[in-house]
């Protein structure tokens, strides 16, 4: 007598179920990825603005701590083309020494000229209430803090503009260094609508 063959049931997904699941995942990725990337690029740009504010703040504190004028030097990086280096020149020799604090800005958020920023004049009129402003050049500049931590000369507000060269959707950021040494960070979109972040 022959034993009846038992039908073994297969465990798992059918090909149709797998294709439907992959299709749903691809649709979710297509919708979510651009939103995620836009938020990620905006975050990178805001982080670069915070780094600029931090190195300016640190340079100011170095001037107060050492009780002497200290420069924050801004120049294109010699080692990394397309990047900008900012550092607190505590010893005043104009050379970036290994012991001096520095930041390196890249494509995710780098300094740009005032002319490439939309509605920069609207930002200045809103934020400065008639004070004169200076935009240090991304291709080379210094910001001097005196021994009390005030900007020298104390008549202008220094405005640093940042943009993300990878994504224009990230907008722009502006770091405003006031004559007394306080710092404001402003955020602007691609059309030039500005609002204060900090």
Locate predicted features.
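N-terminal helix-rich module
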Residues: 2-7, 13-16, 22, 27, ...
